[in-house]
């Protein structure tokens, strides 16, 4: 977990928590790979919430992906910059089975895909997997599709990782939200922001702004995460 740049490691067995790394700017998403190394995104060069939302009012290419390597001596003292010049780097997913890394570039309305060499921590061959409104957190489903939250559309979208085809798997979009989404997409294409569009009229009956999901296997329900005070449980059809 993380809090304004601090990344924590929590042991449920030992009931203990330690700070793994304190980043200068805010950390968005952190994931561990099979080598024990820690990857994390920096959405923008923010040291407070006001600056964070400033990067949602204007497209700024100061997002990045970092990797904190791990060895038998523990974590490195400083992370390696893997990818920079991203427009609000958000959620990402490490797919070691396919040697791919997927990443949400929110202020470009796109999901990127890279070839991954997990042993060296290197990425190559950046391409755009899919175009979608404001991609946020993501998870790989039990069927092998990439589920991505879209706050601006108030939906969860599923991306076929082979073709890039996008379908809606959870939809809480309102009529006003649909119009706000169209406005936001146009603004982002012009290098502008959409923070002022994140209103109660957009979120509708959701407890808060839709930002992610928790997935189980094919027989289990999934949960929709948001910035409110409740998870939404959804039974799979």
Describe these PLM feature segments.
Residues 1-3, 47-63, 106-109, 151-152:
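Short, solvent-exposed loop/turn segments at conserved positions within beta-propeller repeat blades
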Residues 115-162, 169:
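A beta-strand-loop signature enriched in Asp, Gly, Thr, and Trp
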Residues 1, 23-46, 62-64, 79-100, ...:
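Beta-rich, blade/repeat-based domains predominating
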Residues 44, 78-81, 127-128, 132, ...:
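Surface-exposed loop and turn segments in beta-propeller and other repeat-based domains
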Residues 15-18, 75-80, 124-126, 165-166:
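Predominantly a core beta-strand signature of beta-propeller blades
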Residues 11-15, 69-74, 115-119, 160-164, ...:
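Short loop/turn segments that connect beta-strands within beta-propeller blades
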């Amino acid at each position: 977990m993380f809090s304004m740049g601090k990344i924590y490691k929590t042991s449920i067995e030992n009931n203990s928590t330690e700070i793994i790394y304190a980043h200068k700017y805010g950390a968005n998403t952190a994931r561990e790979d099979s080598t024990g190394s820690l990857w994390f995104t920096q959405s923008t060069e923010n040291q407070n919430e006001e600056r964070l939302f400033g990067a949602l009012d204007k497209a700024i290419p100061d997002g990045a992906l970092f990797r904190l390597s791990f060895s038998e001596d523990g974590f490195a003292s400083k992370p390696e910059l893997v990818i920079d010049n991203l427009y609000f780097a958000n959620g990402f997913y490490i797919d070691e089975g396919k040697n791919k890394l997927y990443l949400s570039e929110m202020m470009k309305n796109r999901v990127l895909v890279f070839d991954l060499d997990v042993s060296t921590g290197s990425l190559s061959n950046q391409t755009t997997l899919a175009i979608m409104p404001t991609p946020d957190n993501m998870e790989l489903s039990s069927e092998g599709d990439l589920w991505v939250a879209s706050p601006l559309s108030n939906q969860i979208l599923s991306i076929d990782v082979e073709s890039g085809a996008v379908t809606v798997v959870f939809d809480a979009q309102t009529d006003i939200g649909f119009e706000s989404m169209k406005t936001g997409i146009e603004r982002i294409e012009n290098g502008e922001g959409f923070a002022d569009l994140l209103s109660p009229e957009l979120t509708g009956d959701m407890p808060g702004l839709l930002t992610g999901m928790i997935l189980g296997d094919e027989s289990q329900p999934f949960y929709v995460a948001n910035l409110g005070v409740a998870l939404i449980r959804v039974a799979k059809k």
